[in-house]
Each structure stands twice: as C-alpha cells, then as structure tokens.
Amino acid sequence: NNFGGILQAYALCHILSNIIPQNEVYILTQKEKTFKGRLKKFLDYNSPAQKFIRQYIPINTLSGFTLNEIMKKNITCIVVGSDQVWNTKYYNPLYFLNFLEDNHTIKKISYAASLGSDLWYYSQQQTDEISNLLNKFNAISVRESSAINLLQDNLKIKATQVLDPTLLLQANHYNKFISDDNKRYCYAYLLDYTKKLNM
C-alpha cells in the first residue's frame, strides 16, 4: 500500500508501453510463500491501493524469481526501479537481479533507482555482491544526484540521473484518478516517520 511506489510502477509501465507498444510490459511479482503474507494480501484485497493496482497496473506473478521462471515467460528485458529499491534498509539481491545469474540474453536496466540516502551503508560483503551484479547491467540510471557519486565512489560504476517516472507524464494524465467525492478527510503523506507523527 505504498502509494508513491504504486504511482511510480503505473507511470513506468505506461511510458514503457508507449515506447515499445509491440511488446508486453508488466510488473513482476512473486507469490506470497508464508501464511502471514497471504493473509495480509487477502485482507488488503479491497483497499484503494489494491483496487488501483488491479485496474491500472499489469501484473505477472511468478512462483519464484528464478532464471527458469523468467525464461518460461519469454522476457527480453527487466527494468528495476524506481523508488527506494536500493535502500540499505530493504536490501534484497533480487533488486540487483541476482536471479538472472550470468544470463546475457536478457537486458538488465535500472530506471530512477534510489538508494534513499546520501551515505553508503552497505557492508563490504554486500558492496562486493552489488558491484558484481551491477557490472552485468546494460544501463544504470538513478533518481538522486547523490546516488551517482555513491555508485562511482563505492563501486566505480557510472550512472545517469533521470526523472522519477511519475514526472514523465503530464499532470492532466492523473486527473482521471481524482475522485469527485466531496467528503471531508485528513490526508498525510509521510516520507520519514517520527514518534510524534506516527501516534
């Protein structure tokens, strides 16, 4: 239910579909493996965020992120991003496409990937693993200028700064999502939680 991440996924899919209309573009997700994960998904089914995803974002669910699964889907390119996919707090080798192993036929691209920090918090072991994986990418772009420096200083990898995908669409593109509901409500968009705001 990360509204920012959902809008980024929507915008990136929309842009890619316009650029390569002859190809299918969809979000890869993995089936929930734990009962707790499946229960949460079931309880969230009717949330506004999940309804939006079902209506506007093409999803393709994999039973597992393995090279065999990817090859079965005839996928030719995988794009990672945007949002804080490379934030140390959420470190997951999946976001560096480790499951593609040494496959050279599938293009690997990052679009507006974010580290979510101006400092490098990865351990040496993680840094070595990330360096190995990112060196297999065909193109790397990041959201913040600080990420360019972090990748260069810590991995000797060059990256390009690009716009967040939500900003690639005109503002009026989002008008269709705006509700005509006039009910009063309180809305808060919090990037970093604090004890005071999270009460």
Model-derived features: where do they sit?
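Short loop/helix-cap segments at secondary-structure boundaries that form the rim of catalytic
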Residues: D102, L151-N154, M199
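A conserved mid-protein helix/loop that constitutes part of the nucleotide-sugar donor-binding site
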Residues: Y193-M199
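Aromatic- and Gly/Pro-rich donor/ligand-binding loops
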Residues: N1-F3, L7-N132
